[in-house]
C-alpha cells in the first residue's frame, strides 16, 4: 500500500503519467482480474465495505463510523474489520483502545475501536470469523474493496469532490486502484463528499451504470471555533491540505503548516521541532484525530505534544440523514438473498459460533 501519493497524481496527466502508462495497464489488468475472479468466503452476517476508487484518503473511516452509529441505533452490534495498516501486529487481534497503541495496531483501528468492536487482521476471512465469534451481527470493512476475500453485501465507494480521480490513471501513473469499469460493476453505491465538482464525471458514469449515489460533508465536531487564533497545524494523513482548510474554516490563521506521510510516526526530532516552533512563535498546536492517537501512550516529548495539542475531530454527515440506515437495511436484505443462494449451492459460511481464533 502506498502511504503518500505523488503530487502529480492529483494534477492533469503529465509526461510522468504517460511514461508509466504500460505499468499502469499491467497493474490494472491484474487488479481488475482479481476483483472479477477472486474466490470470496461466505459470512453469516451482512458485510458492508467502505472503500474508494483511489489511493489516499477520501473519508472512509468517518463514513464507517457514521454507519456503525446508525447500526447501534437500530439495536445491532457492528464490528469493524481493518487490515491494521501502519501497525506491527501480524496476528488477528481485537483492538483495545485502552491497551493498544497505534504502532502495534494502526491509527485508524484505534479510532474505530472507540466506537465499536474492532478486529485487525492481515487475513480478512480470519478477521471476519473473529468478529462473528465475538458476537458482531454486522461487519463494516474499512477499505479492502479491491482486494476483499469476503462476500460483500453492500459496497459503498467514497469519493472526494475536490480531488476526484486525480489524473485518472491507474497506479503507478495515477491514484486509481483498478479499472473504473470493474470498480463500478462491483460497487453498490457512491458517496460524494463535499461540494466540489472534481467527482462529477464519476458520478455521471455511476448514474449510467444505474448506481445510486449519496452526498455528505465532513463537519467539525463540537464547538471548535478558533476565530482569530494563530496556530501551528500538523497532519500525517493522505490529504493534509483538506485538514488545513478545515482549520482555516474555523477562523484560525495557520502561521506554520507541517505535513507528514500518511500513517507516519513522528521522530523525536520532528516532535521537538513542532514544540519548539510553537513555543517560540506563541502558536496553538492543532492536529487530526489520527495524528493524536499515533502520539498517545508514549512518554517524553510525545506525551508533551499530546498535552499541548488541540484535536480537530470531524464527522461524516450525510445530506439525507436516513441514508446510513437505508444502507444497513439494503445490506441485510442482500445478505439474506446471498445466504439463500449459497445454501442452495451448498456453500458453507464462516461458523456463526466459531471459537475465537
UniProtKB/Swiss-Prot annotation:
InterPro entries: LpxK, P-loop_NTPase. GO terms for biological process: lipid A biosynthetic process; lipopolysaccharide core region biosynthetic process. Transmembrane segments: none annotated. It catalyses: a lipid A disaccharide + ATP = a lipid IVA + ADP + H(+). Disulfide bonds: none annotated. Pathway: Glycolipid biosynthesis; lipid IV(A) biosynthesis; lipid IV(A) from (3R)-3-hydroxytetradecanoyl-[acyl-carrier-protein] and UDP-N-acetyl-alpha-D-glucosamine: step 6/6. GO terms for cellular component: plasma membrane. This is Tetraacyldisaccharide 4'-kinase. The gene is lpxK.
Amino acid at each position: 500500500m502506498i502511504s503518500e501519493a505523488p503530487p502529480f497524481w492529483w494534477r492533469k496527466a503529465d509526461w510522468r503519467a504517460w511514461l508509466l502508462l504500460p505499468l499502469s495497464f499491467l497493474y490494472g489488468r491484474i487488479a481488475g482480474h482479481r476483483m472479477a475472479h477472486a474466490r470470496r468466503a461466505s459470512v453469516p452476517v451482512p458485510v458492508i465495505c467502505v472503500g474508494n476508487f483511489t489511493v489516499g484518503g477520501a473519508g472512509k473511516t468517518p463514513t464507517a463510523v457514521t454507519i456503525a452509529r446508525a447500526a447501534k441505533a437500530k439495536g445491532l452490534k457492528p464490528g469493524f474489520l481493518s487490515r491494521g495498516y501502519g501497525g506491527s501486529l501480524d496476528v488477528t487481534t481485537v483492538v483495545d483502545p485502552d491497551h493498544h497503541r497505534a504502532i502495534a495496531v494502526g491509527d485508524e483501528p484505534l479510532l474505530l475501536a472507540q466506537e465499536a468492536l474492532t478486529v485487525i487482521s492481515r487475513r480478512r476471512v480470519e478477521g471476519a470469523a473473529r468478529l462473528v465469534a465475538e458476537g458482531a451481527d454486522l461487519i463494516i470493512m474499512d477499505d479492502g474493496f479491491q482486494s476483499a476475500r469476503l462476500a460483500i453485501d453492500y459496497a459503498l465507494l467514497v469519493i472526494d469532490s475536490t480531488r476526484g480521480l486525480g489524473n485518472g490513471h491507474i497506479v503507478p501513473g495515477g491514484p486509481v486502484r483498478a479499472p473504473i469499469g470493474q470498480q463500478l460493476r462491483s460497487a453498490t453505491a457512491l458517496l460524494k463528499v463535499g461540494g466540489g465538482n472534481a467527482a462529477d464525471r464519476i458520478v455521471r458514469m455511476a448514474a449510467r451504470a444505474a448506481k445510486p449515489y449519496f452526498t455528505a460533508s465532513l463537519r467539525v465536531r463540537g464547538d471548535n471555533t478558533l476565530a482569530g487564533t494563530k496556530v501551528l497545524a500538523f497532519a500525517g494523513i493522505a490529504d493534509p491540505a483538506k485538514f488545513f482548510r478545515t482549520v482555516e474554516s474555523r477562523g484560525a490563521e495557520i502561521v506554520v503548516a507541517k505535513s507528514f506521510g500518511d500513517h507516519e510516526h513522528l521522530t523525536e526530532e520532528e516532535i521537538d521541532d513542532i514544540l519548539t516552533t510553537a513555543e517560540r512563535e506563541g502558536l496553538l498546536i492543532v492536529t487530526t484525530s489520527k495524528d493524536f492517537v499515533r502520539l498517545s501512550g508514549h512518554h517524553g516529548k510525545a506525551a508533551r505534544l499530546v498535552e499541548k495539542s488541540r484535536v480537530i475531530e470531524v464527522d461524516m454527515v450525510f445530506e439525507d440523514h436516513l441514508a446510513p440506515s437505508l444502507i444497513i437495511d439494503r445490506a441485510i436484505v442482500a445478505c439474506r438473498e446471498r445466504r439463500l443462494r449459497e445454501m442452495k449451492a451448498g456453500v458453507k459460511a464462516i461458523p456463526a459460533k466459531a471459537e475465537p481464533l
